[in-house]
Amino acid sequence: MKTMPTSAVLGCLLLAGAAPAAYAACEVQGGKIQAAMTTNASTMDAILSTTNASRQVAIYLFESLVTYDENYQVIPQLAESWVRSDDGLTYIFTLRDGIKFHNGKTMTADDVTASVQRFLKVSPGAGRFKNVQSVETIDPKTVKFTLKADFPFLSNLAIPSPTVAIYPADIVAKYGDKEVTGADIIGTGPYKLNRWRPDVSISMSKFPDYVTDTRFKGPTGFGGARTACADEVNFLPVPEEAARVAGLQTGDFDYAEALPITAVPQLEGDKALKIEIVKPRWAILVELDHKDPWVSKKPFRKALEAAINPEQILQAASFGRKDYYRVQPSIFFPEQKQWYSEAGAQAYNAPNADTVKKLLAEAGYNGEPITFITNQNYSWMFKASQALAAQWQKAGINVKLELMDWPSQIKRAQEKADWGINQTGWSPRLDPFQTLSSLQCGTVSAFGYCNQAMEGALAKVNSGLPDDERKKAWAEVQQIVWDDLPVIRIGDYFEPEGTRTTLKGYIPFYVTPRFWDVSQTKK
């Protein structure tokens, strides 16, 4: 057996002696933080949703055995340490002492076992753990996982969307496969749920008995030593960009996400505000319906790619602000050094009108209409789709842009209802496993795509290979992505967000605002 004590796992992270000695979590205690968000969570039950809005809330309320740090590396959270067998088929976790739930009960291994078993049964993320045979309690501080086959278990256990949230065992028993609601939304996080009024607000209050992880000298990623400085954090759904801008300026909001780039010059001139660029943030891409009679033909897909000038698309999406986009072909962002790859890059950013004509002729295409669905909820998506449609139409591809609201677009895409191209964006994936739903045969977001070479490459990268071999296997996957085009990646879009200068200690993060270790100094 291989022991993974915290000293080994955390040696290069923010541990005692590794962070500045003068670090102080809170400049002041108390106050309230009002955060303007683009949308509201669909549920407070952390294991039931993969949406960004649900994840943004879950990380305040719940914790897992392990999580990701600032550098996309797995770190312990509720786990004190773990042991992995030599064959990779057994993991034994020892839990931290004295962890309290929001209802005052102390966490034990039974809570972990019950929560994980429920996740494996009802969560849309359960597919990450198809090779988990069992999870069982050994003693009050020890949990054992037995695997059917070796796979990147820790990486998948740390993924926060949906998170493998730990609930009290009695709550799990009460709800089973039903949605946990109301006062039973109980976790171990630094904030607890006050109230949720769908489409109005999510209110969270400081959990006074939160057990800070003293192995760290400060927060990192989704974990580390987290401290609730503000008494209350409120997430307010404000879908209108103009309303988020106005509220930030007037002080109704202390924070606003996804600000329109067109408002940035005005906001940057306001000394009461601080505007940040969230980088990385989104990969702009289009998904393809591989059941469509034209999109299903590889020469047609290659023609779509050969007609694209990504620089022009990204300029349109960012209103010409070069600091808000990046032309690059990797599915993982350059900041994610473990997975960044330029495999297949020769197919990217190589527009050629003659090549497009040859490929369309090979596909037998004669100007038949192709429905391209998009939305205006995300201005960068809309601008990108307009520019893409113009490039394709100029190249002789008869795309018909169809506008709808974002929820309707998602529903139509999932129902595979009369469309060929779907404008979308991907937030940062933390592990190759998170790409399976878009690349693997039979998965919901692959939209009919199936390639046996891809199946083999995906199986390899999602096996229990050492990290360096997994990286090589991932490069094979990306090579096939660019050779076969299950999706078409355009480039990176970075997003502006803003805070009032009365918020002290706030640090932007690529998937969600983090208001732990943030002080509200407004009187």
Where would I find each of the regions flagged by the language model?
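Periplasmic-binding protein-like
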Residues: 295-336, 383-384, 481-491
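Structural transition elements
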Residues: 191, 323-362, 378-383
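Aromatic- and charge-enriched surface segment that lines or borders ligand/interaction sites
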Residues: 80-125, 138, 144-146, 247, ...
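Surface-exposed binding/hinge segments that line
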Residues: 23, 28, 94, 127-173, ...
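Periplasmic binding protein-like
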Residues: 35, 104, 384, 390-441, ...
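N-terminal lobe/hinge region of extracytoplasmic solute-binding protein
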Residues: 36-86, 111, 117, 498
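Extracytoplasmic/peripheral linker and loop segments enriched in polar/acidic and small residues
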Residues: 347-349, 398-409, 417, 435-501, ...
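Aromatic-rich, solvent-exposed beta-strand/loop patch
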Residues: 102, 146-165, 185-243, 264-282, ...
